[in-house]
């Protein structure tokens, strides 16, 4: 059964978006990740360092990267992709890089096991510092709103979400919305699994291979 949660970031901590992604990347149960962001940052904050720290190079895993909304971020996106390629090039971890075609601005994360999408995030958050960095309330952070979808019948996925929900302060619980996915409400002929697969195919069709 698929469930979904809507997280409105009310303060710098806890950063639900960051915590779910890193917990999922750090879990060797998953064998494929899709990271789609308008911006990847490589300066004082390094998105690639966060990914590399979470995904051990000894794992057999595939990582697909989609990005580069604006040309002004080309240098940082190229550096991000180069860092990942160089780190994983002699490992069993494979990386694939894609550049958005014009007008694409999606922010999507998908974790798969044997082809099945088990945890997904569709949101407003990019993988840049304002949304993804581990920051305090005294530092600049972005107020974002993200939708998390997971297969609650999968024990590993369920545990990641449960662990995250257990650490939510009481004053923030009113900013979190959780529900079961109701397939009979709309588009009943398309399952949640199929919708996520269609979403990834749409991203791939609206992107070009990015040479690194």
Language-model features: locations:
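PLD/PLD-like phosphodiesterase catalytic module centered on the HKD motif
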Residues: 1-212
């Amino acid at each position: 059964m698929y469930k979904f949660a809507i997280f409105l970031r009310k303060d710098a901590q806890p950063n639900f978006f960051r915590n779910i992604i890193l917990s999922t990347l750090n879990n060797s149960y998953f064998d494929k990740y899709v990271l789609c962001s308008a911006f990847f940052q490589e300066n004082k904050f390094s998105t690639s360092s966060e990914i590399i720290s979470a995904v051990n190079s000894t794992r057999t895993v595939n990582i697909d990267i989609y990005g580069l909304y604006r040309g002004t971020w080309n240098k940082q996106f190229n550096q991000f992709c180069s860092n990942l390629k160089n780190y994983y090039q002699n490992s069993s971890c494979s990386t694939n890089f894609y550049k958005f075609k014009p007008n694409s601005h999606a922010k999507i994360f998908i974790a798969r096991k044997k082809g099945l999408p088990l945890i997904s995030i569709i949101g407003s958050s990019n993988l840049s510092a304002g949304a993804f960095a581990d920051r305090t309330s005294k530092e600049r952070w972005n107020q974002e709103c993200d939708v998390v979808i997971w297969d609650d019948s999968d024990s590993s996925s369920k545990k990641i979400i449960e662990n995250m929900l257990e650490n939510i302060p009481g004053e923030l619980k009113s900013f979190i919305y959780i529900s079961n996915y109701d397939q009979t409400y709309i588009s009943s002929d398309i399952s949640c699994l199929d919708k996520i697969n269609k979403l990834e195919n749409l991203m791939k069709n609206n992107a070009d291979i990015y040479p690194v």
